[in-house]
Amino acid sequence: AEIVAFDLDSRFVSPEQAERRFRHAAACVKPARLIYKTVDSTLRGNLGPETRGALTGSGRRLAIVAPAFPDAGRTTVGGRQYVDGVALEQTAFARDPKNPIVTSYVMERMAGLEPTRFQVFDAAGNGELDELVGRIGIAEPVVWVGSPGLAAALSRALSPEENAPLAQPPLRASKVLVAIGSLHPANDAQLASLRQAGAVLVTLPEAADPEAVAQEVRAAFARADVVCLMSPRSRAAAADHAAALGAVVSRCTPAFDGL
């Protein structure tokens, strides 16, 4: 295969487990031309231990860390991460129930990895990410660490012809299910816009019966082309809510063609 991807589910495990998972995964693809370790653009999770594991497993000495995702308003300026111009620790992400953020400094979020083994790069736009990739070079034996922004820059460098505009627009879904499991205020604004445009809201109750809620979702598609399924608004039992949300979605797949 040209691309091998690992879903290591390491955000909520201990730092030791996260490092071990990444070390084993990186060892499996050690000869690869390019090794890319994804990070959340709001710096949640075990960033330092994961990167340490990727470096150890791959045998590479240096990580290039550029977590900016300009298309989503996430930028890195002066080594600090911003969301729509607001320092990370001043945003709603600071109150994440599982991964509260107390600092926007990328260096501090990389704790657990020796400073000599990684370099942090600023980027406020896609052009800066493209320049970074060009400056380091695709062939350099490093571990790239970033969000979708850096991944897109690497893709543009690897296959510029494949990133040309599409000759035809992609097909549009006729029935769309919007699953909302985040408590971020931005989701409330997005949900309000969707409902104003005619979307139907189905709220997942506490201790829900997935099949009963799935029936409600399927019935809602008879009235609207867009149905929003929202998890309970409490921060307690977030993992249970996520599992219930997934159980409902899996039972509704015949009813929609866009998610």
Task: List where the protein language model places each region.
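Hydrophobic alpha/beta core scaffold segments
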Residues: 34-37, 146, 223, 227, ...
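Short amphipathic alpha-helices and their capping/turn segments at secondary-structure boundaries
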Residues: 55-62, 213-222
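Conserved, well-structured core segments that form the ligand-binding/active-site neighborhood
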Residues: 81-215
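Anion-binding catalytic surfaces of enzymes that hydrolyze or transfer phosphate/sulfate esters
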Residues: 199-202, 215-232
